[in-house]
């Protein structure tokens, strides 16, 4: 079994979620050891919420869960890449497919590059 280095990074490691078919980066979150183990056990992406200080099963409220299709780890065993099937079409809590829906050109204000899939005000009441 792979041993991830949670100690090097203060107990949390970066976890990148990528669409398993297109390769599009959907989001960056963090995992502690409990989130890592839950992800391995369930096959569903589970992260550690830094704001709530608790485990967070992606999509638990919105229904936009991430089914893990493949897991890769980096050369230092301190970053995880999850190749996922994004259910419901949106990974971002603001209702977009990707959390990286804004583009910056030459330091100007960000430009929204995607259409919103859902209204977060209706989903997160």
Swiss-Prot record:
Q: Name one GO biological process term.
A: L-histidine biosynthetic process
- Give one Pfam family, short name only: PRA-CH
Matching InterPro entries, A to Z? PRA-CH, PRib_AMP_CycHydrolase_dom, PRib_AMP_CycHydrolase_sf
One CC-aspect GO term: cytoplasm
Q: Name one GO molecular function term.
A: zinc ion binding
Chief place where the protein resides: cytoplasm
Question: Cofactor note, please?
Answer: Binds 1 Mg(2+) ion per subunit.
Look up keyword Amino-acid biosynthesis and say if it applies.
yes
Please describe what this protein does: Catalyzes the hydrolysis of the adenine ring of phosphoribosyl-AMP.
Query: In its UniProt entry, what is this protein called?
Result: Phosphoribosyl-AMP cyclohydrolase
Q: What is the lineage of its organism?
A: Bacteria, Pseudomonadati, Thermodesulfobacteriota, Desulfobacteria, Desulfobacterales
